[in-house]
Amino acid sequence: MNEKIKPFEGKMQKSLDSLKEEYVGIRAGRANPHLLDKLRVDYYGTPSAIQAVANVSVPEARVIQIQPWEAKLIKEIEKAIIASDLGLTPSNDGKVIRLVFPELTEERRKDLVKDVKKKAENTKVAVRNVRRDANDAIKKLAKANEISEDEQKQIEDEIQKITDKFITEVDKVMEDKSKEILTV
C-alpha cells in the first residue's frame, strides 16, 4: 500500500469505529452496561463515569443493577439516567438502582432501525469525504510534479478500493445491528 494513503485509511477506520461505538449505545431490548458509558455524574465537583463511582452488573437479561460506592450518589445517578435519552426510569431501594428494560414495541424497533440506518449513512458520507480529501491531496502532488500521472491514477484506484471496503463494512455493521434490534 502506498504510504500517502495510510493517514486517509486511518481516518476511514476511525469513522467506522465511531459508528460501532454509537451502535453499542442503541439498546436492542437487552440490558447492556455499555449504555451507561456516556453518562456522567457529579462526584465531588468532577464529572465522572457511572462505572467509576459504582458497581454496574446485569443480574437478568433485561435488568441493569447499579450499586454506588457512596449512598449519596444514588440521587445523582438517577438524575443522569432520567436526563439521558435512554428512555428508562430508575428505581432504587436506598442502596441499589435498578434499570428494567421493557420489551421494545414493534414501532420502537422500527424507529431504532431508522436511527441505525441514519447513523450508517452519516458514516458513509464521512468515509466519502475522506476519499475526496485523499484524492485532492494526490491531485496536488501530481500538479506539483511530485508523482506521475500513472502513479496518480494508481493511487486514486487504490483509494477507491479502500473506500469501497469501508462502505461495505459500514453496510455489514448496519445490517447486523438492524437484525439484532428486530430480533424479538
From Swiss-Prot:
HAMAP family: RRF. The keyword Protein biosynthesis applies. Its main location: cytoplasm. It is found in: Cytoplasm. The gene is frr. It comes from Lachnoclostridium phytofermentans (strain ATCC 700394 / DSM 18823 / ISDg) (Clostridium phytofermentans). CDD domains: RRF. GO terms for molecular function: ribosomal large subunit binding. Belongs to the RRF family. This is Ribosome-recycling factor. Keywords: Cytoplasm, Protein biosynthesis. One of its GO terms (biological process) is translational termination.
